[in-house]
Amino acid sequence: MGHVAVLASSNENKLSELRHALDGWTIELLGADDYPPETGATYYENARAKAEFGRARAGDRWALGEDSGVEIDGLDGGPGVLSARWAAGREAERALEELEGVEGDGRRARYVCELVAITPDGTEHRGTGTLGGRIADTMSGAEGFGFDPVFIPDGEDRTVAQLGNDWKRDNSHRARAARALLVSIMQS
């Protein structure tokens, strides 16, 4: 089942991951410069606002909205929905700075992603994905973006940036959200 969709984002990395996860779909970046501000209290609210923004410009295509972040136990679940604005391109470095001296469970973390798809007729589908793990003591690895150089997934001993983009495309919170989105679509 393939659909033609616009992703209400300017993030090429997210586009690449979603093209892989939503195999058979044709997805393009909306590429607008005037996205609505992320003012939602939840990932869903932000993803839905982006999808609605995209829908107004998508014509007869589906509109995809995505919001994601990392929740770190030692930061009381932060930065959470504020992840994109929390460190302005220095996510991994800031996480290490904020967690200096924090050990054990305080370094537990989870990536969270919410995807919302709105069809041309206005039907909404959504999928949520999470990836549990912990924040490393130092940055390692060259692939990925954001928190990937410091995020070690459960069951692994290397960061997402070390595991690489191929691993991430199949196992990330975004890939899991895409699979959940496909289930939602198939069940409707």
Listing of model-derived features with the role each one plays in the protein:
Residues 2-6, 12-188:
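Anionic-ligand binding patches
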